């Protein structure tokens, strides 16, 4: 058995981005795959998500564990200019969540010999993100003027000064069958 093509995208039934408990964007694995087809002409992300250009490559029995890196392309994170200003969302809460529902692994396996595989599992899940924060005076200025950019002599000035990368780790993943 082997994973279906683009298994990284196929395993995502949906991914929701929530701010203060409210869903502000929701995508599914098929849409992530379509976005990849439209925005990755050189196929650089294909190895990251288990995607191949020839379906015959999926006929080989896979016995090794694999690692996939799945970019979650929500509407606000395609480029830094589309970043979501959380403090302008109308809520005092700055908490945000990403909720991901995975498909059953049995639906992601290709069985070419008619056999079954009972050992497929997700053993680890990590989410990586970059969080940008503004200085207090910048936040106040943006709230007052509702402008996220300024132009000086035709050049764009970015207001973001602090970058804080973080990693979320989850030990146990529960999949719906």
Locations of the language-model features?
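Short, low-complexity Pro/Thr/Gly
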Residues: 1-177
């Amino acid at each position: 058995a082997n994973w279906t093509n683009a298994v990284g995208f196929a395993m995502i039934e949906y991914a929701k981005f929530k701010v203060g408990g409210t869903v502000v964007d929701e995508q599914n694995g098929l849409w992530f795959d379509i976005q990849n087809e439209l925005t990755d002409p050189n196929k650089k992300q294909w190895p990251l998500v288990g995607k191949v250009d020839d379906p015959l490559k999926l006929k080989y029995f896979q016995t090794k564990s694999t690692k996939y890196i799945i970019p979650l392309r929500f509407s606000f994170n395609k480029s830094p200019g589309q970043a979501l200003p959380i403090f302008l969302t109308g809520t005092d809460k700055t908490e945000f969540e990403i909720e991901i529902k995975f498909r059953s692994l049995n639906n992601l396996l290709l069985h070419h010999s008619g056999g079954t595989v009972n050992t497929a599992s997700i053993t680890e899940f990590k989410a990586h993100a970059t969080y940008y924060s503004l200085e207090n005076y910048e936040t106040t200025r943006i709230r007052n003027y509702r402008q996220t950019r300024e132009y000086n002599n035709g050049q764009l000035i970015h207001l973001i000064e602090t970058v804080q990368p973080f990693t979320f780790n989850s030990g146990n993943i529960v999949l719906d069958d």
